[in-house]
């Protein structure tokens, strides 16, 4: 009972504190410190741990350069193997030829082609006759995927029976040409052999230029909308396909916004623009120009900085701006085309356009600066000699290294082909022109076709929204001819993508059995359901954040580009080749892609915690956007004589200086130059962005050969120490099963220690390692499947041996733990192992005893109605050791016991009459944790900690001068960031806290009320806390809804149009039934505002920097306060502007050895209404101690933006011999779709008009 606990606490302190003055905050804090340190010492067994480790390991100061090189070579070897597998697939495909069978759709023929459909999960199909009858034939399946959880795919259900084939929604899956190519690409034997060679080989892929994707092993398809089976994916839009299929591109999209581009035409134009943007990768650069009577470039600088890198951040930003423009006036091609060429080619010099009337009225010398004149139908173009020379020389140097220049014209027609303009700017045909004629009724084909055909391009007619996806890919096919023609130049050249979220790994929606009503017998069923769901969620966590990079090769047969063979590599696997266990606990590895964007970094937060969708800028973050400066001061050299000259000082040129220095740091890392390593004073933030820790990092970098990646290492000051085994060679024969016999240990769920067989999903990671440990003990050597991660396995075995007697040590403290309401102790190690000890407190239940089955009878059986239970701090909430929040906090505050309180776990009182520590009649208690990093001199051994019922804190504070009471004497414990760990106000409710409505606990102290606000200001002023400003460059903001609608004049008629389309749809369906069902396969999916996959999610938010002030404890600082009085002379403070009677004294003292600060706020006897907000309101916003993230409104600078060049663009295939009409076999190649081609896809267009509109 709690009464017994109170008596025990009382007895302990009577002897310890006889001379203890409870009216002195200094003495209270000192005695509390001694108690907390003693408790932690008894629970952690720190001395025993150090003695155990000293027998096995020793401290080593490592060389960061040498460790980085070792990691670099491991990663290179790992990537090389994956690259070879993709290359084997390429060679195998190129050795095959496409058969010319004509009976591929005849089930009775030997040539009938089946394939395993990713969407159906089997090889069954439905065939429609290509005639007016539309007769359909259903072909039954002969094989289906038997999907089982795969241990090597993070428990994703897969099948090795066959590869799966995905076909985009707009394509008919029984098209004969498509089927022949699907059959040609069946290289499952190669995929299977590759998979058998390497257990951790991820998905092997092939994307055909025809649109289908083959992947192995098979897995169920991830739908964009599961309920409606919405599928927006097309592998031809992926970065790995685009990179291999085309040269890198500078693209200018010209969007006709003339008065005729109204209603449906503009909607089609917008979708066409999105589809083009979808096909641009980070190796490409782009801008969008709208033109009518005026021309506008949609970037914030109106084109003055040329082209933007084709990141999702930039693409969505410009796409949003399209919605602010309206159709109006005439399309002024004579204004738009010269500007397009000028921006695209970065032309130097200047030009001017004059109407012929203006030209005739000008004096002879008015245009002396413009020596060149070109007469156009409506204008005269006058240009300077420099401008003409720039054209003749191929443009400026603003092409950012991309290989080809491309103009994409989206229009409903052009009055002229403007041959003079193209002859002037593009005489050598170096700029490709692709034209997209939009609208059902568009008839002006000739002019736009001539523009494309005369400039190495292609013209397509995009009749409606259903027409877009497939038509866009004609430009990719056109540009891929160059790759096919120059296949000998590519050799074994591989292409690597940046980071992206692989959809094949994403968790599928949970499918439950047919729902049944809850009965009195459902109790056990529901609890078992909830338990299994918890396990499923733990296993799928890694997959939900699965980001990959992909290596790809173009597949070329007879100089014809056929597609791209690829293998993707999960970044979590690459990260284990540069393992955090090999360096200091505060230091970290990071990786940059070929564009200098961050791939892996502990500060990268790619998932929006609200939407669970990846952020727009998740794969285009700059390193220095994550390495957030402490005070924007930067040191770019460790050379002492240079530092003083390089540190920026406040003044007019401060911002410019900081920018230059940060660019110097970035350049050093990109260039992998370790001759003069760089330093930055940064703030390291926790994942939830509620805490930041200052540290000084030194940066090192190594280039990853072949992949063009950069591996970096940030070593925190004083953190270049680690532990190593004393014996050079580990003796596996000394492994004892007793080390793991108690079963109370866990391994990092996302790290591989020893490889498993695909089918080993019935066992846990811990059970699997026990099997391998037994083999080690029996054979005296490491099993083959453990050799790949031998270094980590040896570290794990050392940690197991050193901590093997911890359970016995914890047993000796059973009574002490029980008396102090401690029910869990743990020790986490850098190897990813966590050893823990459970103790069940007698007065508490770990499953909600007040839950009743009868309250849920009548509902459908669901885990939502299951009995609530305790969330174990280790096994349920924190299994990732060094990657867990508490671990990262502990190692950043050396020699400090960290105290925290959790709102995601609780335990229940057994007695209904038991009161909380605050005296309230509630049936549960919160839980708190204490943890601390354990060191062997300067090297981290791990983090030790324990969990306790929060009642113990309330009872303990009552014996240290802070009993639960009213607000006359307000006593608090603040943590290292001024969050409230304890408050003695007696109306604090555990139940309210656990549902997010609590008072004081875990809240920022300075935001509680006016008294706390003033006290916080005094704490900062007296150096108890240091103020920092943190900028979150990964934040997102909600986009304001656009009130300006495009093509607004047709909006009143939208419902009429919708009625007509619904009527048309009904007639199509009726015709389908009459004709035997030929059109039945057409999708019946509701209208969706998003057109393409990338723009389907996250359209209502945009990236924006946000800033917040943080306050960090100065307990070890040079200016640590010596007085406990926050006001000189211990005078009273009157913080209320509207209440002169409020008078308080404020004191503070560090609780040494912990992260806590004790604060007392005592009201004078005559003081009144200090906490009445109507008489003592807060300063909002607070000028002295602001807190909370707010958007940073930066003025968009349009000068000297950094020109980022991709390392991937070093390879360019020449287009000089690329003729748009004649192939290498002297066949005529059209530069536009023929009318017959248009007629052949009419049924598809009709169906997909319904798909996109309703």
UniProtKB/Swiss-Prot annotation:
Q: What residue ranges lie in the Extracellular compartment?
A: 20-1233
Give the residue spans that cross the bilayer: 1234-1254
- Signal peptide residues are 1-19
Locations listed in the record? Membrane
Cited Pfam families: VWA_2 (PF13519), VWA_N (PF08399)
Its membrane topology, per UniProt?
Answer: Single-pass type I membrane protein
List the glycosylation sites: 100, 140, 146, 302, 365, 520, 558, 757, 838, 903, 923, 1130
Concerning InterPro entries, the annotation shows: Ca_channel_alpha-2/delta, VWA_N, VWF_A, vWFA_dom_sf
Which residue ranges does the record assign to the VWFA domain?
A: 250-479
Keyword hit for Cell membrane? no
Q: Mind listing the GO biological process terms from this record? A: egg-laying behavior; locomotion; nematode pharyngeal pumping; serotonin receptor signaling pathway
Q: Which GO terms describe its cellular component?
A: voltage-gated calcium channel complex
Is Calcium found in the keyword set?
A: yes
What keywords would UniProt list here? Calcium, Calcium channel, Calcium transport, Glycoprotein, Ion channel, Ion transport, Membrane, Signal, Transmembrane, Transmembrane helix, Transport, Voltage-gated channel
Q: Where, if anywhere, are coiled coils annotated?
A: none
Recorded GO MF terms = voltage-gated calcium channel activity
Return the SMART domains for the record. VWA (SM00327)
> Which SUPFAM superfamilies does UniProt cross-reference here?
vWA-like
Q: Which purpose does this protein serve, as stated in its record?
A: May act as an auxiliary subunit of the unc-2 voltage-gated calcium channel which appears to trigger calcium-activated signaling pathways that control the serotonin response. Inhibiting serotonin sensitivity of the vulval muscles results in egg laying defects. May act in both neurons and muscle cells to enhance motor activity as it is required for coordinated movement. Has a role in neural depolarization-induced calcium influx and pharyngeal pumping. Involved in restricting the expression of the putative olfactory receptor str-2 to only one of the two AWC neurons.
Q: What name appears for this protein in its UniProt entry? A: Voltage-dependent calcium channel unc-36
**Native source species:** Caenorhabditis briggsae
| Gene name per UniProt | unc-36
């Amino acid at each position: 009972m709690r009464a017994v606990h109170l008596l025990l606490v009382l007895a302990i302190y009577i002897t310890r504190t006889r001379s203890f003055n409870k009216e002195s905050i200094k003495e209270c804090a000192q005695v509390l410190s001694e108690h907390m340190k003693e408790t932690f010492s008894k629970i952690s067994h720190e001395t025993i741990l150090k003695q155990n480790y000293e027998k096995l390991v020793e401290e080593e100061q490592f060389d960061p350069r040498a460790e980085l090189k070792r990691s670099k070579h491991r990663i290179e070897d790992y990537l090389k193997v994956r690259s070879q597998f993709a290359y084997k697939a390429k060679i195998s495909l190129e050795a095959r030829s496409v058969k010319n069978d004509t009976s591929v759709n005849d089930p009775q023929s030997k040539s009938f082609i089946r394939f395993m459909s990713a969407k159906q999960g089997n090889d069954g199909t439905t065939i429609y006759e290509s005639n007016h009858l539309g007769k359909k034939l259903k072909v039954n399946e002969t094989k289906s995927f038997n999907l089982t959880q795969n241990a090597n795919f993070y428990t994703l259900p897969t099948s090795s029976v066959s590869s799966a084939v995905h076909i985009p929604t707009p394509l008919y899956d029984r098209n004969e040409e498509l089927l022949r190519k699907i059959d040609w690409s069946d290289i499952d034997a190669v995929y299977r052999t590759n998979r058998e060679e390497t257990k951790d080989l991820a998905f092997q892929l092939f994307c055909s230029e025809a649109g289908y994707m083959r992947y192995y092993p098979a897995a169920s398809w991830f739908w964009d909308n599961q309920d409606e089976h919405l599928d927006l994916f097309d592998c031809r839009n992926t970065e790995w396909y685009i990179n291999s299929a085309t040269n890198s591109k500078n693209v200018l999209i010209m969007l006709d916004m003339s008065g005729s581009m109204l209603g449906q035409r503009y909607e089609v134009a917008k979708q066409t623009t999105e589809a083009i943007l979808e096909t641009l990768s980070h190796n490409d650069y782009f801008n969008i120009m709208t033109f009518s009577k005026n021309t506008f470039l949609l970037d914030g600088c109106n084109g003055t900085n040329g082209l933007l890198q084709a990141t999702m951040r930039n693409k969505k930003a410009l796409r949003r701006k399209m919605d602010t423009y309206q159709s109006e006036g005439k399309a002024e091609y004579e204004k738009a085309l010269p500007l397009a060429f000028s921006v695209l080619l970065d032309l130097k010099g200047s030009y001017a356009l004059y109407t012929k009337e203006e030209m005739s009225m000008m004096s002879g010398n008015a245009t002396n600066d413009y020596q060149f004149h070109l007469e156009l139908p409506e204008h005269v173009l006058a240009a300077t000699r420099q401008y003409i020379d720039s054209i003749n020389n191929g443009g400026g140097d603003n092409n950012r290294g991309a290989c080809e220049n491309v103009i994409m014209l989206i229009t409903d027609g052009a009055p002229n082909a403007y041959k003079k303009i193209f002859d002037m700017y593009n005489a050598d045909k170096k700029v490709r022109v692709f034209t997209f004629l939009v609208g059902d009724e568009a008839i002006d084909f000739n002019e736009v076709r001539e523009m494309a055909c005369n400039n190495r391009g292609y013209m397509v007619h995009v009749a409606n929204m259903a027409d877009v996806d497939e038509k866009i890919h004609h430009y990719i096919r056109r540009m891929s001819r160059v790759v096919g023609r120059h296949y000998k130049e590519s050799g074994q050249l591989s292409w690597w993508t940046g980071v992206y979220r692989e959809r094949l790994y994403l968790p599928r929606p949970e499918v439950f059995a047919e729902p049944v009503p809850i009965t009195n017998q459902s109790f056990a069923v529901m609890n078992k359901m909830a338990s299994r769901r918890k396990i499923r969620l733990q296993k799928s966590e890694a997959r939900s954040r699965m980001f990959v990079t992909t290596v790809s090769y173009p597949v070329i047969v007879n100089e014809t580009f056929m597609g791209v063979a690829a293998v993707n590599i999960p970044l979590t696997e690459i990260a284990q080749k540069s393992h955090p266990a090999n360096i200091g606990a505060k230091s970290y590895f990071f990786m940059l892609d070929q564009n200098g964007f961050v791939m892996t970094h502990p500060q990268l937060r790619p998932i929006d915690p609200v939407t669970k969708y990846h952020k727009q800028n998740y794969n285009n973050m700059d390193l220095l956007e994550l390495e957030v400066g402490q005070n924007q001061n930067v040191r770019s050299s460790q050379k002492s004589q240079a530092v003083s000259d390089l540190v920026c000082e406040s003044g007019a040129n401060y911002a410019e200086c900081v920018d230059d220095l940060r660019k110097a740091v970035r350049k050093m890392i990109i260039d992998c130059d370790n001759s003069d390593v760089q330093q930055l004073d940064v703030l390291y933030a926790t994942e939830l962005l509620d805490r930041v820790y200052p540290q000084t990092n030194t940066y090192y970098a190594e280039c990853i050969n072949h992949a063009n990646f950069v591996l970096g290492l940030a070593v925190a000051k004083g953190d270049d120490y680690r532990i190593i085994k004393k014996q050079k060679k580990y003796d596996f024969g000394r492994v004892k099963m007793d080390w793991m016999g108690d079963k109370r240990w866990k391994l990092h769920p996302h790290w591989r220690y020893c490889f498993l067989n695909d089918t080993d999903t019935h066992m846990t990671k811990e059970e699997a390692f026990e099997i391998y440990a037994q083999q080690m003990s029996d054979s005296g050597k490491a099993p083959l499947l453990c050799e790949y991660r031998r270094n980590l396995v040896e570290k794990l075995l050392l940690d197991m041996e050193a901590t093997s007697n911890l359970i016995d040590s914890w047993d000796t403290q059973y009574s002490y733990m029980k008396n102090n309401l401690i029910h869990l102790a743990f020790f986490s190690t850098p190897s990813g192992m966590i050893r823990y000890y459970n103790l069940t407190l007698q007065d508490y239940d770990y499953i909600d005893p007040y839950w009743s089955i009868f309250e849920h009878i009548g509902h459908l059986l669901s885990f939502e109605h299951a009995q609530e239970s305790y969330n174990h701090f280790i096994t349920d909430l924190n299994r990732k050791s060094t990657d867990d929040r508490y671990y990262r906090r502990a190692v950043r505050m050396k020699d400090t016991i960290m105290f925290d309180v959790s709102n995601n776990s609780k335990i229940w009182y057994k007695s209904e009459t038991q009161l909380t520590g605050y005296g309230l009649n509630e049936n549960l208690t919160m839980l708190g944790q204490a943890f601390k990093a354990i060191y062997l001199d300067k090297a981290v051994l791990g983090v030790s900690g324990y969990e306790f019922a929060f009642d113990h804190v309330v009872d303990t504070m009552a014996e240290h001068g802070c009993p639960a009471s009213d607000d006359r004497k307000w006593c608090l414990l603040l943590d290292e960031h001024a969050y409230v760990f304890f408050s003695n106000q007696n109306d604090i409710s555990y139940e309210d806290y656990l549902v997010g409505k609590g008072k004081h606990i875990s809240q920022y102290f300075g935001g509680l009320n006016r008294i706390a606000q003033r006290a916080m200001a005094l704490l900062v002023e007296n150096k108890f806390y240091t103020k920092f400003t943190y900028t979150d460059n990964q934040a997102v903001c909600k986009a304001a809804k656009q009130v300006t609608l495009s093509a607004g004049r047709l909006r009143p008629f939208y419902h009429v149009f919708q009625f007509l389309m619904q009527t048309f749809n009904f007639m199509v369906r009726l015709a389908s039934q009459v004709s035997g069902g030929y059109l039945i396969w057409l999708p019946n999916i509701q209208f969706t505002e998003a057109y393409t996959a990338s723009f389907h999610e996250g359209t209502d938010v945009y990236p924006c920097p946000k800033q917040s002030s943080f306050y960090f404890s100065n307990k070890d600082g040079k200016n640590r306060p010596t007085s406990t009085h926050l006001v000189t002379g211990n005078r009273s403070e009157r913080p209320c502007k509207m209440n002169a009677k409020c008078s308080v004294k404020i004191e503070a003292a560090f609780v040494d050895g912990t992260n806590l600060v004790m604060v007392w706020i005592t009201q004078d006897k005559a003081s009144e209404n200090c906490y009445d907000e109507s008489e003592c309101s807060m300063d909002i916003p607070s000028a002295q101690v602001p807190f909370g993230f707010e958007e940073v409104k930066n003025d968009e600078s349009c000068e000297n933006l950094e020109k980022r060049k991709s390392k991937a663009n070093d390879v360019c295939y020449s287009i000089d011999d690329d003729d748009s009409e004649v192939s290498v076999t002297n066949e005529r190649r059209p530069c536009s779709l023929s009318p017959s081609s248009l007629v052949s896809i009419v049924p598809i267009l009709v169906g997909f008009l319904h798909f996109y509109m309703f």
